[in-house]
């Protein structure tokens, strides 16, 4: 979704403004907006300070909860949209087709990723089969106030957003931790399985021993064709931690890695302590985010970093329907363009190997012209590179083609 104009729907943008006590158009110089901006800065400062006790305090404060929902909720929500795009690119994953659909947001906060799913489905209603009778939305969070807020915002969203009338939406929110008990879990009715589980900014905060216990529980909670998505902020430390959790899930469960890694192996980014695997999302922020950025000097409109892993319970792996190259010829771009006089370079990875590519300006051709447009996160098909000591050289005859973004 690098090249797409990712935005919030007008429905959600207005709901979040209303929840924060604001109206449209946003008055950038109003006392309420200036106060909201200061509260966003407080949230950022406390997170950067690494105070582990602050998260609970943040969501128990109504003022800070409003600031978070108005600013950080959309910033985090949009990270899910390209991940869902990538999931439903698969020709055999046709959306939600069973009569009963269940979706779980672990550590749901004020409803961030459930709202992300709803935003995506509102824009892609072909993914909702006419055979669906009921869609259960589940949110679990340790903070009571989050559960209350999520239920309020999502209920209002469903009341005003247009969805097929044949389906019934039911909301289930629970206050507690998925990590405080075994399986079956007291927060979840026995036998419940989910078609989609999303955990955002949750598991990188727990120790490896706890996650090794939790991993098999996540597997049991997934339906036979279920998807598990882990998302985190995309910092160096959190992304490297997320890779460790990826490896533990692959070790302790039968889940398979769908994306972003194209092959299963030791992540090459761990070889260098300065490296980390992350994406950067381009979007058009809502007006309130623009205004807050101007007040406090943030630049969310320039892009949002994030890291993610998508797992499947049915063995499916990411494929590109329009790609006629064998899988071993498909790689993912994992760096920005490195431009020097007379040449361009970038790194690609397939999950097991990381390669540096170089193309001299004199070697630009029809078969490799996509190289200049490649962005971090793009899947690319490549062939005919010439191995040099420190890189793979792209010749005029080499093929470098960007697949569907």
Where are these regions (language model features)?
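A short glycine-rich, Lys/Arg-flanked "PGG" loop and its adjoining helix->strand segment in the class I
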Residues: 212-224
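S-adenosyl-L-methionine
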Residues: 148-187
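Class I SAM-dependent methyltransferase Rossmann-like catalytic core
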Residues: 54-91
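Conserved beta-strand signature within the Rossmann-like core of class I S-adenosyl-L-methionine
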Residues: 225-232
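Conserved SAM-binding loop of SAM-dependent methyltransferases across substrates and taxa
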Residues: 110-130
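A short SAM/SAH-binding and catalytic strip from SAM-dependent methyltransferases
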Residues: 194-209
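N-terminal auxiliary segments of SAM/dcSAM-dependent transferases
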Residues: 1-54
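C-terminal lobe and adjacent flexible extensions of AdoMet/dcAdoMet transferase-like proteins
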Residues: 291-405
């Amino acid at each position: 979704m690098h090249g797409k104009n990712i935005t919030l729907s007008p429905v959600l943008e207005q709901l979040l403004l209303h929840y924060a006590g604001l109206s449209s158009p946003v008055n950038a110089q109003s006392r309420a907006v200036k106060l909201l901006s200061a509260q966003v800065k407080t949230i950022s400062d406390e997170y950067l300070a690494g105070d582990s006790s602050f998260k609970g305090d943040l969501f128990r404060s109504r003022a800070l909860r409003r600031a978070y929902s108005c600013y950080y909720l959309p910033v985090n929500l949009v990270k899910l949209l390209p991940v869902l795009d990538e999931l439903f690119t698969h020709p055999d994953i046709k959306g939600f087709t069973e009569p009963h659909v269940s979706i779980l947001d672990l550590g749901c906060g004020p409803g961030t990723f459930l709202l992300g799913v709803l935003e995506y489905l509102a824009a892609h209603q072909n993914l909702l089969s006419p055979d669906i009778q009921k869609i259960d939305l589940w949110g679990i969070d340790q903070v009571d106030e989050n559960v209350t807020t999520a239920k309020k915002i999502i209920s209002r969203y469903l009341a005003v957003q247009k969805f097929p009338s044949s389906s019934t939406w039911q909301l289930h929110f629970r206050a507690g931790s998925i990590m405080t008990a075994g399986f079956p879990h007291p927060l979840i009715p026995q036998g419940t399985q989910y078609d989609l589980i999303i955990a955002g900014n949750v598991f990188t905060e727990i120790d490896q021993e706890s996650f090794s216990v939790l991993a098999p529980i996540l597997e049991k909670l997934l339906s036979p064709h279920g998807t598990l998505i882990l998302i985190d902020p995309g910092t160096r430390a959190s992304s490297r931690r997320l890779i460790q959790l990826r490896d533990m899930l692959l070790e302790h469960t039968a889940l398979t890695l769908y994306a972003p890694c194209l092959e299963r192996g030791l992540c090459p980014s761990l070889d260098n302590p300065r490296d980390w695997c992350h994406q950067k999302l381009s979007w058009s922020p809502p007006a309130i985010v623009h205004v807050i950025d101007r007040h406090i000097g943030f630049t969310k409109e320039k892009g949002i970093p994030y890291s993610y892993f998508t797992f499947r319970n049915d063995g499916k792996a990411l494929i590109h329907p329009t790609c006629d190259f064998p899988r071993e010829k498909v790689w993912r771009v994992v760096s920005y363009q490195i431009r020097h006089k007379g040449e361009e370079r970038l790194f690609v990875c397939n999950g097991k190997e990381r390669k540096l590519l170089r193309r001299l300006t004199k070697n630009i051709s029809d078969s490799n012209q996509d190289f200049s447009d490649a962005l971090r996160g793009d899947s690319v098909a490549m062939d005919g590179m010439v191995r040099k000591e420190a890189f793979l050289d792209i010749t005029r005859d080499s093929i470098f083609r960007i697949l569907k973004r």
